[in-house]
């Protein structure tokens, strides 16, 4: 849907978070419609700039939906809600700020190319690295989506490129696809919003559903689940990375065919797994005909994102790593493999039917993991799985009552054996315990900063 199609329509903004507020500001600034209802699932204090609009919450949602023509939905609102399914059947049109941006840019700004990256893990770092290297080579680039600014704010920016991180929530109801897409991987995650794992994977892949013959998609050949579902899109322009005749990661190095491009040890990024994603990023840069060797040099100045294998402090030989972004066992497995020396790993969050068997095997097979600490709702299941799958007698397994206890126990253990890494890699979402992974990561940082340095 184009913005001009919203002119004088009866509109509902569903969800007054960051995206909802940006959408409302855009409609207001361009005088697109004055017949707008704001709906939030729970009561909230409306910012003063929006006080002129009707605000609803907790009322008869079905009646409200039937009273409007268009709903601009926030990403947190699942497309699988019964109310949405019924409203669509009654002719109510649903869109989002992401879809509005993609529509406007692709149909009205042909000079601007949209590059969108998604995946279960690695999308934020991939998007940020791509943006960093494009800016370094002098391109006019906007950054938005699930990172940076809401995409609707970039429509009037006059950019030549828009680099977007797209979540499964944002991809699920797209009606326009980006010019260039990249998939990092698919893991078992987020089934609550999507109802099933298959829905989750197909919602991710909807990012390329509307790509045409001039568009392109880069796919990580090394991720089995991604390749299982991408096979449904054989008719699209799919190009694979992490293959021998293209960009691929080997050990701590990134290659193009037989030529070494960079070494992870020359970067500020922690984690060899980042090279898998950089193979996709460099594939995009090559497609844009940018200088690959210059890009490799520019990566050396790239600053890692907070809460993603973030080095917090070193105290008495113990290094504290904040990986709060880790919301799946696969992320923690990659994190463990990223470090040498003694490791105490802290994991646990909300229980969302994750399978921790591979995580337990990783701990069992890595004798450098001296202690595993579990906590929160999923803690008992993680501990039970480790006990069942691990044969190690030297592994210390602690079920903590709080994050503070987990940090202190890990610190004391590693300090007593000459130092090491305290790795906070939760393996599960934070909802119910923290507002988001950033708040969770900051709590870890605050605890570390209060430790006794003696």
Q: Model-derived features: where do they sit?
A:
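Short, basic phosphate-binding NTP loop
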Residues: 1-116, 137, 300, 306-310, ...
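Nucleotide phosphate-binding/pyrophosphate-handling subdomain across enzymes
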Residues: 2-11, 22-26, 30, 264-369
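Residues in the short beta-alpha loop(s) of Rossmann-like NAD(P)-binding domains
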Residues: 17, 42, 147, 222-223, ...
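Residue-level signal for inorganic ion chemistry
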Residues: 27, 71, 117, 146, ...
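Phosphate-binding loop of NTP-binding sites
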Residues: 28, 62-66, 75-221, 225-236, ...
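Short, conserved loop/helix-junction motifs that constitute active-site signature segments
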Residues: 31, 174-177, 207-213, 232-234, ...
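Short internal beta-strands
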Residues: 36-41, 217-221, 346-347, 368-377
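C-terminal helical cap/extension that packs against the catalytic core
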Residues: 357-418
């Amino acid at each position: 849907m184009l913005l001009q199609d919203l002119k004088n329509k009866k509109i509902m903004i569903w969800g007054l978070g960051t995206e909802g507020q940006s959408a409302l500001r855009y409609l207001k600034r361009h005088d697109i419609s004055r017949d707008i209802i704001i709906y939030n699932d729970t009561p909230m204090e409306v910012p003063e700039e929006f006080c002129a609009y009707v605000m609803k919450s907790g009322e008869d949602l079905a009646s409200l939906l039937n009273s409007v023509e268009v709903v601009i939905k926030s990403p947190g609102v699942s497309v699988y809600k019964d109310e949405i399914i019924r409203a669509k059947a009654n002719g109510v049109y649903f869109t989002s700020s992401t879809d509005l941006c993609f529509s406007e840019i692709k149909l009205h700004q042909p000079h601007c190319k949209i590059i969108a990256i998604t995946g279960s893990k690695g999308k934020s770092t991939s998007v940020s690295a791509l943006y960093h290297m494009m800016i370094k080579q002098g391109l006019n680039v906007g950054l938005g989506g699930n990172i940076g600014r809401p995409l609707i704010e970039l429509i009037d920016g006059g950019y030549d490129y828009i680099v977007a991180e797209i979540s499964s929530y944002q991809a699920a109801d797209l009606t326009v696809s980006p010019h260039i897409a990249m998939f990092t991987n698919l893991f078992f995650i987020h089934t609550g919003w999507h109802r099933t794992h298959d829905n989750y994977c197909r919602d991710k892949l909807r990012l390329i559903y509307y790509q045409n013959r001039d568009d392109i998609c880069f796919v990580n050949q090394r991720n089995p689940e991604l390749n299982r579902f991408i096979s449904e899109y054989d008719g699209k322009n799919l190009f694979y990375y992490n293959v021998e005749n293209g960009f691929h990661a080997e050990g701590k190095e990134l290659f193009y065919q037989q030529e070494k491009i960079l070494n992870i040890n020359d970067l500020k990024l922690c984690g060899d797994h980042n090279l898998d994603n950089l193979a996709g990023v460099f594939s995009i840069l090559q497609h844009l005909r940018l200088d690959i060797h210059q890009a490799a040099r520019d990566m050396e100045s790239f600053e890692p994102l907070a809460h993603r294998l973030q080095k917090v402090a070193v105290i008495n030989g113990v290094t504290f790593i904040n990986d709060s972004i880790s919301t799946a066992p696969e992320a923690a497995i990659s994190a463990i493999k990223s470090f040498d020396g003694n490791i105490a790993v802290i994991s646990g969050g909300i229980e969302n039917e994750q399978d921790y068997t591979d995580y337990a095997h990783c701990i069992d097979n890595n004798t450098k993991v001296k202690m595993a600490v579990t906590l929160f709702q999923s803690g008992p299941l993680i501990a039970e799985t480790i006990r069942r799958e691990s044969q190690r007698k030297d592994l210390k397994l602690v079920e903590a009552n709080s994050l503070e206890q987990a940090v202190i126990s890990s610190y004391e253990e590693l300090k007593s054996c000459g130092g090491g890494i305290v790795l906070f890699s939760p393996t599960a979402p934070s909802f119910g315990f923290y507002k988001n992974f950033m708040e969770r990561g900051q709590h870890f940082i605050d605890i570390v900063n209060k430790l006794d340095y003696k």
